[in-house]
Amino acid sequence: MPKLPPLSLYIHIPWCVQKCPYCDFNSHAQKSDIPEQDYIYHLLQDLQADLQRFKDSIQQRKLHSIFIGGGTPSLFSAESIAYLLKEIKKQIDFEDNIEITLEANPGTVEAERFKGYVSAGIMRISMGIQSFNDDKLQRLGRIHNAAEAKSAVNLAKVSGLKSFNLDLMHGLPNQTLEEALDDLRQAIELSPPHISWYQLTIEPNTMFAYRPPKLPDDDALWDIFEQGHQLLTMAGYQQYETSAYAKAGFQCKHNLNYWRFGDYLAIGCGAHGKLTFPTGEITRFSKTKHPKGYLRGEYLYEEKNVPKIDRPFEFFMNRFRLLEAVPKQEFEDYTGLSQSAVKNQIDFAIQQNYIVENADSWQITEHGKLFLNELLELFLTEE
């Protein structure tokens, strides 16, 4: 019988001011007034339905973290966020040291709103900066400029937040090594507790997919990563996940729970959740993507059981994104499988120097990080 992992809650707010050309998230450009109050009502109804539907999994569990993502959640007022969190707490208990994060766009925040979010219960803000180069920001379709980004960061510092994150991208259209490193230097100078540093990828069904920009080649990308990683490390940021760097004590609890194969409720348009049951079942589910259907009360879109044969791949796909060692006991606890179920794959991975092991854990190697896809393919099941 699996041990139940920590339980988080993801809340999706789908609206944004305009759709960015690289974005493949479930986001909808704001064409008129956002039905803020109506949407909050439906989020709470959605949660209530899930707590009833999945009551055998939830039982007496408390929320470990909450992440409000989008879209651009900072389009919603602090009053709405305060009401939402207060009503959620009436339905399910919070752990004493819960982490509550809200995503914000530097172009949609101002001093009073940040302070209002803190009063509402937000402890951590994640800001979509992406770049401090105005030309690059324009090419990415962002609505803020570098000066507004820095202003937003400075507001975050004095707002009473426990932590904040800056999202930055590299490998941007026509970006040079020096431009990429300059973005990082400017971010480091602002001294955020956490930096997420992603490589831009062209996703299907985005504007960039239809009209692909010229991106740096693989050699240039490697130089950017290698020198950027060195810059961040020297500035006191520790890499703990493929794209995540944090000062000591400021790792994102919510994302760590995802990557450690934890459980998470999910409410809002297109949100995806995962729950483990005392019976050993693991369920994944998703919500109606379009706001029109969701606002009609059509919440649950799909629910499916994760068969035991698929669990090793799902577990390691998440776990090997982290640089920390993987406790063998957690594999058994969270998948309901014994280590013998993956012995052949593990032995081969060790032979290929993708991972090393000791009595208690498996650890991905530097070589394994470079060949992550090949490592994960070992755990894929044949159709």
From Swiss-Prot:
<dbReference type="InterPro" id="IPR004559">
    <property type="entry name" value="HemW-like"/>
</dbReference>
<keyword id="KW-0408">Iron</keyword>
<dbReference type="GO" id="GO:0004109">
    <property type="term" value="F:coproporphyrinogen oxidase activity"/>
</dbReference>
<comment type="function">
    <text>Probably acts as a heme chaperone, transferring heme to an unknown acceptor. Binds one molecule of heme per monomer, possibly covalently. Binds 1 [4Fe-4S] cluster. The cluster is coordinated with 3 cysteines and an exchangeable S-adenosyl-L-methionine.</text>
</comment>
<keyword id="KW-0949">S-adenosyl-L-methionine</keyword>
<keyword id="KW-0479">Metal-binding</keyword>
<feature type="binding site">
    <location>
        <begin position="71"/>
        <end position="72"/>
    </location>
    <ligand>
        <name>S-adenosyl-L-methionine 2</name>
    </ligand>
</feature>
<protein>
    <recommendedName>
        <fullName>Heme chaperone HemW</fullName>
    </recommendedName>
</protein>
<feature type="binding site">
    <location>
        <position position="130"/>
    </location>
    <ligand>
        <name>S-adenosyl-L-methionine 2</name>
    </ligand>
</feature>
<dbReference type="InterPro" id="IPR034505">
    <property type="entry name" value="Coproporphyrinogen-III_oxidase"/>
</dbReference>
<dbReference type="GO" id="GO:0051539">
    <property type="term" value="F:4 iron, 4 sulfur cluster binding"/>
</dbReference>
<dbReference type="Pfam" id="PF06969">
    <property type="entry name" value="HemN_C"/>
</dbReference>
<feature type="binding site">
    <location>
        <position position="10"/>
    </location>
    <ligand>
        <name>S-adenosyl-L-methionine 1</name>
    </ligand>
</feature>
<feature type="binding site">
    <location>
        <position position="20"/>
    </location>
    <ligand>
        <name>[4Fe-4S] cluster</name>
    </ligand>
</feature>
<keyword id="KW-0143">Chaperone</keyword>
<dbReference type="InterPro" id="IPR010723">
    <property type="entry name" value="HemN_C"/>
</dbReference>
<feature type="binding site">
    <location>
        <position position="70"/>
    </location>
    <ligand>
        <name>S-adenosyl-L-methionine 1</name>
    </ligand>
</feature>
<dbReference type="InterPro" id="IPR013785">
    <property type="entry name" value="Aldolase_TIM"/>
</dbReference>
<feature type="domain" description="Radical SAM core">
    <location>
        <begin position="1"/>
        <end position="241"/>
    </location>
</feature>
<dbReference type="InterPro" id="IPR006638">
    <property type="entry name" value="Elp3/MiaA/NifB-like_rSAM"/>
</dbReference>
<dbReference type="GO" id="GO:0006779">
    <property type="term" value="P:porphyrin-containing compound biosynthetic process"/>
</dbReference>
<keyword id="KW-0349">Heme</keyword>
<feature type="binding site">
    <location>
        <position position="167"/>
    </location>
    <ligand>
        <name>S-adenosyl-L-methionine 2</name>
    </ligand>
</feature>
<feature type="binding site">
    <location>
        <position position="142"/>
    </location>
    <ligand>
        <name>S-adenosyl-L-methionine 2</name>
    </ligand>
</feature>
<keyword id="KW-0411">Iron-sulfur</keyword>
<comment type="similarity">
    <text>Belongs to the anaerobic coproporphyrinogen-III oxidase family. HemW subfamily.</text>
</comment>
<feature type="binding site">
    <location>
        <position position="23"/>
    </location>
    <ligand>
        <name>[4Fe-4S] cluster</name>
    </ligand>
</feature>
<dbReference type="InterPro" id="IPR007197">
    <property type="entry name" value="rSAM"/>
</dbReference>
<keyword id="KW-0004">4Fe-4S</keyword>
<keyword id="KW-0963">Cytoplasm</keyword>
<feature type="binding site">
    <location>
        <position position="103"/>
    </location>
    <ligand>
        <name>S-adenosyl-L-methionine 1</name>
    </ligand>
</feature>
<dbReference type="Pfam" id="PF04055">
    <property type="entry name" value="Radical_SAM"/>
</dbReference>
<dbReference type="GO" id="GO:0046872">
    <property type="term" value="F:metal ion binding"/>
</dbReference>
<dbReference type="GO" id="GO:0005737">
    <property type="term" value="C:cytoplasm"/>
</dbReference>
<feature type="binding site">
    <location>
        <position position="16"/>
    </location>
    <ligand>
        <name>[4Fe-4S] cluster</name>
    </ligand>
</feature>
